[in-house]
Regions:
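A short, highly charged nucleic-acid-interacting micro-segment common to nuclease
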Residues: 116-132
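Sequence-pattern detector for short linear motifs
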Residues: 73-75, 134, 155
Length: 158
């Protein structure tokens, strides 16, 4: 915990990021940050399905505004752990991991490799990457997949 706070303070000083108010980083937040790091980016809908979906049946209606997901992502953005980028083909934002979020993951030893987070989405592969993220979410939710190795990890181990 001390290491994490020290890393956050150091990155805030170096990047001049201001944090509105303190908050507790939960295990779900760390998992969410790791997911965004591994998948390069995530949409609000994808984060809802992966981390916040409490519907008893998959056929039940999805909440219209995904309010809880939206609130938590806003907290992580204010803390400087996530940033948003507009996708003009969908008129929706996607979320990317910031350098501060990456430092938090490194300090918690949550990563299999240590490549810097993606700074810009390559829109040539946007649809492909988004669909892979949905496939991963579906496989993990159905418990058919327990450990996911992203393509970036596999390429770094060659």
């Amino acid at each position: 915990m001390e290491i994490e706070n020290a890393v956050i303070e150091e990155v805030k000083k170096s990047s001049r990021v201001s944090v509105a108010k303190p908050f507790r980083l939960t295990e779900r937040d760390v998992s969410l940050l790791r997911f965004v790091y591994e998948q390069k980016f995530a949409t609000l809908e994808l984060l809802y399905f992966r981390f916040f979906d409490k519907r008893p049946n998959a056929s039940d209606a999805v909440p219209e505004n995904m309010w809880v997901t939206r609130q938590r992502v806003a907290v992580l953005k204010r803390a400087g752990l996530l940033r948003s980028q507009m996708v003009y083909t969908e008129s929706k934002a996607i979320y990317l991991l910031t350098q501060l979020g990456y430092q938090v993951l490194k300090s918690k030893r949550e990563l299999f490799h240590y490549a810097d987070p993606v700074q810009q989405v390559d829109f040539r592969y946007f649809e492909h990457d988004k669909r892979i993220s949905y496939c991963r979410t579906a496989l993990e939710r159905s418990e058919k997949c327990y450990l996911w190795f992203p393509e970036r990890t596999l390429r770094m181990q060659r």
